[in-house]
């Protein structure tokens, strides 16, 4: 199942690459994604934060870093890969959506499964963690756990935006 969403994401990345090659402002990208959705009868959602763009489909998310100046302060996708690797070593990987790097046309794209939030309230992610999980998250400086940055997988909290802030 994992490779299925990654394979589908890799097929969509050339389209994203074209859109990003001539658009540098979020509102232009959003407009192009809207036109793509109409043309292809798709429902791709475009979102952006301080350092990353996200292209969200029903079963996967593709992230790409764009604001390289702020990555040191706010974290980027490579930071998520490092956090996940440490979580794997410590047996906490189940807390995080696994992110996979895919290089295409000189740009690194990061693919993760779509995790759905159900009935999330802002800043209550910590209430859903065990003492050990909470300690690990705090020890590794994982912040910004509001309702857009976590969801539920197999009845357990799953963090989807987890760059550490040092």
What are the language-model segments listed below?
Residues 134-141:
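Protein kinase catalytic-loop region centered on the HRD/HxD motif
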Residues 1-43:
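Juxta-kinase regulatory segment immediately upstream of eukaryotic protein kinase catalytic domains
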Residues 40-90:
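ATP-binding glycine-rich loop module of kinase domains
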Residues 60, 65-68, 85-131:
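Conserved structural core of kinase catalytic domains
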Residues 49-50, 107, 145-147:
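Short, surface-exposed coil-to-beta transition loops
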Residues 141-166:
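Catalytic activation segment of kinase domains across protein kinase-like and atypical kinase folds
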Residues 56-57, 104, 152:
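Generic beta-strand structural signal
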Residues 73, 123-127, 163-166:
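Active-site Asp-x-Gly
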């Amino acid at each position: 199942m994992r490779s299925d969403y990654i394979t589908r994401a890799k097929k969509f990345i050339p389209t994203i690459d074209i859109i990003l090659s001539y658009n540098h402002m979020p509102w232009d990208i959003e407009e192009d994604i809207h036109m793509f959705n109409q043309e292809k009868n798709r429902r791709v959602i475009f979102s952006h934060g301080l350092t990353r763009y996200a292209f969200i489909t029903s079963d996967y998310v593709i992230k790409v870093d764009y604001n390289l100046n702020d990555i040191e302060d706010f974290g980027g996708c490579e930071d998520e890969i490092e956090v996940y690797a440490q979580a794997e070593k410590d047996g906490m990987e189940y807390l995080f959506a696994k992110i996979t790097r895919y290089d295409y046309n000189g740009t690194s794209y990061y693919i993760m499964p779509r995790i759905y939030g159900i009935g999330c309230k802002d800043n209550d992610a910590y209430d859903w963690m065990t003492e050990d999980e909470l300690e690990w998250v705090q020890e590794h400086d994982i912040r910004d756990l509001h309702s857009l940055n976590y969801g539920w997988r197999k009845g357990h909290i799953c963090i989807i935006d987890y760059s550490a802030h040092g």
